[in-house]
From Swiss-Prot:
The gene is nuoI1. The lineage of its organism: Bacteria, Bacillati, Actinomycetota, Actinomycetes, Kitasatosporales. This is NADH-quinone oxidoreductase subunit I 1. Its cofactor is [4Fe-4S] cluster. Keywords: 4Fe-4S, Cell membrane, Iron, Iron-sulfur, Membrane, Metal-binding, NAD, Quinone, Repeat, Translocase, Ubiquinone. Transmembrane segments: none annotated. It comes from Streptomyces coelicolor (strain ATCC BAA-471 / A3(2) / M145). [4Fe-4S] cluster 1 binds at C60, C63, C66, C115. Its EC number is 7.1.1.-. The keyword Iron applies.
Length: 211
């Protein structure tokens, strides 16, 4: 058969449709997100979480090692000293300010490896998109883990008869009976008078503050 007069590009469309027809019968990999959400892996690198001890005190000691380890400069930490009147962690210091900028964060997990107290871990939450850059800066209050049974919100006193090492040995499993939350003077809170005469959100009088 003489092929001299045949156009060499004649078979190109046929070859192209051949690829299309073969793909029509393959298993589809498209996921109907967000209508159908796929379960993430157990060790998925999602939004960060600041963890608590079993009694509710914070694990973060404000060492800033996570900020130094971050290759994207996305973490900002300010440490402060604990006092007996206002204690946030069992140790000497705590993280007074903790921010993560998710406009910069690459979710690499290097900050998790650098944390000496396991205060920082990563959750399975990945829906972090927002229309505002300011909303992508998560504060300590947004990152701090919620309270579970047996916990009292910080600040409060450490478990009587224990020290910081006992917390890391796992000897403290819940808040001591009668533990109450302390007044957060560093956050501008003031002592409140009784609810019988003042509301829970009304400022205390100068007479009460001077006591």
């Amino acid at each position: 058969m003489d092929h001299k007069g045949t156009d060499p590009g004649f078979m190109n469309p046929v070859a192209g449709f051949g690829v299309t027809f073969k793909a029509m019968f393959k298993k589809r990999l498209t996921e109907q997100y967000p209508e159908q959400q796929k379960t993430t892996a157990p060790r998925f690198h999602g939004r960060h979480q600041l963890n608590r001890h079993p009694d509710g005190l914070e694990k973060c000691v404000g060492c800033e090692l996570c900020a130094w380890a971050c290759p994207a400069d996305a973490i900002y930490v300010e440490g402060a000293d604990n006092t007996d009147e206002e204690r946030y962690s069992p140790g000497e210091r705590y993280g007074r300010v903790y921010q993560i900028n998710y406009a910069r964060c690459i979710l690499c997990g290097l900050c998790i490896e650098a944390c000496p107290t396991r205060a920082l871990t990563m959750t399975n939450e990945f829906e972090l998109a927002d229309s505002s850059r300011a909303n992508l800066i998560f504060t300590k209050e947004q990152l701090l883990a919620g309270l579970e049974e047996g916990m009292v919100d910080s600040p409060h006193a450490i478990y009587p008869g224990t020290d910081e090492q006992d917390y890391y040995r796992g000897l403290v499993t819940e808040a001591a009976p009668g533990t109450v939350q302390q007044v957060a003077h560093s956050k501008g809170e003031v002592v409140q008078e009784g609810d019988s005469t003042f509301g829970a959100t009304e400022p205390a009088s100068e007479e009460v503050i001077r006591r």
